[in-house]
Amino acid sequence: MTCLYPGTFDPITNGHLDVIKRALKIFDEVIVAIAKSEHKKPCYDLEKRKELALLATQNLKNVKIIAFDNLLVDLAKELKVNTIIRGLRAVSDFEYELQIGYANHALWEDMETIYLMPSLKHAFISSSIVRSIVAHGGDVSSLVPKEILPFLKDQSCM
């Protein structure tokens, strides 16, 4: 069985990788679906975020990276995948994710959402925290995959 793990991944973090690895224990394949997310005004463009995710997951089997700019439910139908994985770091994430999960289910009755918590050591990591630390010249080597560190040196978008 295959699941979709959608997100902005701006940039992909060790927290994201942790959720991917946990999902692989449940599913045969994880499709990481990188959203255009113009409303979030991402730091990195869609192609760069996809490139970084490909680098970060290159050693993981059964992980596919795609980019999309349409409704998640439409993408899921197109791929014939009815299960979405979402990572939850804190209770504050749950309220938002629950609303999105209900909306997706309202758009497609077959759509299911499974919420996974990251490991405790990754529970505080977010892409926005990573961008903030980089913007202030801090070390994010423990927060992001080593494969993408060289790309974070360019702080022009942070």
From Swiss-Prot:
Q: In which pathway does it act?
A: Cofactor biosynthesis; coenzyme A biosynthesis; CoA from (R)-pantothenate: step 4/5
From the Swiss-Prot or TrEMBL record, state where the protein is found: Cytoplasm
Q: Which chain positions carry the site (Transition state stabilizer)?
A: H16
Q: Using the UniProt record, give the first listed, main subcellular location.
A: cytoplasm
EC supergroup of this enzyme: transferase
Q: Which positions are annotated as binding substrate?
A: T8, K40, L72, R86
Q: Give the record's GO biological process terms.
A: coenzyme A biosynthetic process
| Family per similarity comment | Belongs to the bacterial CoaD family.
Quaternary data = Homohexamer.
Protein known as: Phosphopantetheine adenylyltransferase
